[in-house]
Amino acid sequence: MSRIGKKPVPVPAGVTGSVEGQTVKAKGAKGELSFVVHDEVLVKMEDGAVRVDPRDQSKEARSKWGMSRTMISNIFVGVKDGFEKKLEISGVGYRAAMQGKNLQLSLGFSHEVVYDVPAGITVAVPKPTEIVVTGIDKQQVGQVAAEIREYRGPEPYKGKGVKYAGEKIVRKEGKKK
């Protein structure tokens, strides 16, 4: 039994939610999102909350039950508050800057890395060593942050590279003489 799936998803104040067949739509101050629920899962609106139940007791239905509930919860939180992911850059000469709508990264390569920011995502650079990715779609915010981190992930010896804020890098000891 999914313990997460049992809980109905409350529709927050300031957000309008609707269920049309297998599609859940949310509209709030930050924008509009929708999620198409898998056919193995039943979804219905009950007294200001979205209820999610498995269609039957098959393994597929039960495995998609909790995930569907969490995805619906994420679209409600996204249109109300939005999501944010912070990245930190460490290393000599490593820095970031916005160039119009593109993110320009100096990461020790012979060339500048230019990242084209997708629609629906906002990237800010408060400091040259800090990047803030914001948006209403949690999956897209995480994907953009992961793509930026992938250009130069943190290395284990000196910790140089792009890492998530608060990420603990497992350090290795260098060679001994």
Swiss-Prot record:
Spans through the membrane: none
Pfam family, one: Ribosomal_L6
GO CC annotation: cytosolic large ribosomal subunit
Family matches, as PROSITE patterns: RIBOSOMAL_L6_1 (PS00525)
GO molecular function terms listed in the Swiss-Prot or TrEMBL record: rRNA binding; structural constituent of ribosome
Sorted UniProt keywords: Ribonucleoprotein, Ribosomal protein, RNA-binding, rRNA-binding
One of the GO biological process terms: cytoplasmic translation
Similarity field: Belongs to the universal ribosomal protein uL6 family.
Function: This protein binds to the 23S rRNA, and is important in its secondary structure. It is located near the subunit interface in the base of the L7/L12 stalk, and near the tRNA binding site of the peptidyltransferase center.
Subunit structure: Part of the 50S ribosomal subunit.
HAMAP family (UniProt xref): Ribosomal_uL6_B
Protein name: Large ribosomal subunit protein uL6
